[in-house]
Curated annotation (Swiss-Prot):
Pathway info: Bacterial outer membrane biogenesis; lipopolysaccharide biosynthesis
Protein name: dTDP-rhamnosyl transferase RfbF
Top EC class for this record: transferase
Any single biological process term in GO: lipopolysaccharide biosynthetic process
InterPro entries in the cross-refs: Glyco_trans_2-like, Nucleotide-diphossugar_trans, RhaTrfase
Family affiliation: Belongs to the glycosyltransferase 2 family.
EC number: 2.4.-.-
Length: 296
């Protein structure tokens, strides 16, 4: 067992086949596994693969991705983790994924490193979205054989972090509950001069969003109305954070309105999306944080 690398997986009503496959892959790659469960509707302990080698933390209610990750981080650090890697419940990794990331970090003295992502359905690379200090976004398109590069942000799944980063930057922001958690934390790292190393030779299959629709050339992720609430509200909360570029925060507020308008125009439960957007806007302006109205 590689005792200094811990994997933190946050679950919420997971598809057991995918989750168990990920756990098996991590165990085969000599990684300790910590599962933090956000109130799954069935007893997870009896259904996990190799449960005696998995540390399962069951929360009494949905505490959100940020708090669940923090609980997993603290447990891992208490057990002596030197590096922590995060995964979604439906993530899948290839052979030597953990070893390659860890070796790269050691060889290049990188504090944070992550893979590139391949769309599960369309089999193309997702571009990496780099956010500059002035708030402008830059899409970095990944090509086969590309050399490693640095980015200000990445998604949490598949990202490996050295323990000292948490000592310098702090934990995930529990005020945000779910959306923008990884973006805000990465921008906090950027504020301390810590960038994410992206390694194109290390790949991970990923699916973003429940589904999406393409309107006027724009891919709009279609989440539930409640999930849209957090997306919209948190865009306003970003305006309150000094390390988040103002231009980025304004962009997210504007785009949240555009996206909601397009979702209302194309989806059946229009009234529910409209209500959630109005409530999210009001709560965001008032500074309502955490799970707010809907954590249970």
């Amino acid at each position: 067992m590689n005792s200094n690398i811990y994997a933190v997986i946050v679950t919420y009503n997971p598809e057991l086949k995918n989750l168990n496959a990920l756990i098996t892959e991590l165990k085969e790659q000599n990684c300790y596994v910590v599962v933090v469960d956000n109130r799954t509707n069935f007893t997870l302990k009896d259904k996990l693969a190799d449960i005696e080698k998995v540390h399962l933390i069951c929360l009494g209610r949905n505490e959100g991705i940020a708090k669940a990750q923090n609980i997993g981080i603290r447990y891992s650090l208490e057990k002596g983790a030197e590096k922590i890697i995060f995964f979604d419940q439906d993530s899948r990794i290839r052979n030597e994924f953990i070893k390659k990331l860890s070796c790269y970090m050691d060889n290049e003295n990188a504090k944070i490193a992550g893979p590139v992502f391949i769309d599960r359905d369309k089999s193309h690379y997702y571009p990496i979205c780099n956010i500059k200090k002035n708030g402008l976004r830059e899409k970095i398109h990944v090509t086969e054989g590309q050399t490693p590069f640095k980015s200000s942000v990445t998604i949490s799944s598949g990202t490996m972090v050295s323990k000292e980063v948490f000592e310098i930057v702090g934990m995930m922001d529990e005020e945000l509950f779910i959306d923008y958690v990884d973006t805000e934390w990465c921008l906090r790292c950027l504020n301390y001069g810590i960038l994410v190393h992206i390694i194109p030779d290390i790949k991970m299959v990923h699916a973003i969003g429940d589904k999406s629709v393409k309107i006027c050339g724009i891919n709009i992720p279609i989440h539930s109305p409640v999930r849209r609430y957090y997306r919209v509200r948190n865009a306003f909360l970003l305006l309150r954070k000094n390390h988040v570029p103002l231009l980025l925060s304004i962009r997210e507020v504007v785009f949240s309105l555009i996206h909601t308008t397009l979702i209302i125009a194309t989806q059946k439960n229009k009234i529910e999306y409209m209500k959630k957007h109005i409530l999210a806007t009001l709560d965001g302006i008032r500074g309502i944080t955490g799970g707010g109205r809907y954590n249970a």
